[in-house]
Amino acid sequence: MITEDGAQLLKASEAGGSEGPVWDGKDSLYFTGRGRIFRLDAGGTTHVFREASGGANGLLFDRERRLVVCEAANRRVTRTEADGTITVMAESFEGKKFNSPNDLTMDSKGRIYFSDPRYGKRDSMEMNVEGVYRIDAPGVVTRVLGRDLVDRPNGLLVSPGDRYLYVADNNNNNTGAARKLWRFALRADGTVDGQSRKLIYDWGDGRGPDGMEMDAKGRLMVAGGLNKAQPPHETDKSKGGVYVLSPKGKLLEFIPVPLDEVTNVAFGGADLRTLYVSAGGTIWSIRVKTPGLAH
């Protein structure tokens, strides 16, 4: 068992946390939902960090502990500076607006990778690619994965040593579309070796993978699945929860979460042994034996 003996899944916050949990490296968990960014402090109180968040989804703290935000509604990625000002990191590619930046990860050099899918209405899309991009500096953006290798990218994770980029490919709006977790080799320059694509896990015709994290033993914690089918596109064959996978894709364990939709995970607490899960407008927590990787 990866969880502590007797550990139970607990409700940490019911403020409306639907996505983006991230530990700030000190004493708080940040997360998104209801158009806001929230902060859950060490005492268990939830605060509104930002009221108008631009439809914030995925969150990340960079090496200088600045909050980087996927603003899905504003179709951009921003960074909050120490003085509270906002720096736009990415808002277009080749003159076209992004679809709706969703989730992000960072490599050891501080380069940020983000996914740009479009769920729901598609009439405002300016590009026909739902890709993965790398930000080297504000406004310096490169597409690293396109439609030839991913269908609808969502959660991302760079492995230790920048060896791999894991991509949750989750097109849950179409029957028979991708609900897969891929692994790609990362080159030193931050580009992706497309020929290295390896299938790690397939959710079949259920709800596919979303956000993910890795623990200190290299095991993947992947949010995914669905407790109640959503016909015609999604069955409930893969239940909602956290899928604990080996680096090669073996299902080692499953942590069920009772509410849909299970969207993301984060390690937190002073020892990084509290696993937080966003699902059903709630932030859940459970204690685990092995800490998560520090960011």
Please give the residue ranges for each predicted region:
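Sequence-structural signature of mature extracellular/luminal beta-sheet repeat domains
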Residues: 1-295
